[in-house]
């Protein structure tokens, strides 16, 4: 999938809506982690590290030469608060919701994977970190 195309945009909208529909609270982010890993694997990170601090994961994109590392981080967990909206992608997990914006933040960070896959860093490495609660 080429970055910055309608297909790319549609994939990000779909990911964000899936994350929003199925929020998981602190220390129970297993399905969220798997969903993010499935998305990232399409964009061939040099290394995908799982089970960091529980359900956390990190995707590493290596540069062509040695250099500094840049880490971009987001959180995986939702809140133990029910959602009262009527949108089609509202939370399907009773009493849980991404009313904190973490679903959007995860999508933004995951959205860097296609860009990094298409254009690796010139030097150093970029780490996309998805942190559990």
Model-derived segments and their meaning:
Residues 125-127:
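Residues at or immediately flanking beta-strands
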Residues 76-78, 129-133:
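Acidic, glycine-rich active-site loops and adjacent beta-strand->loop/helix elements
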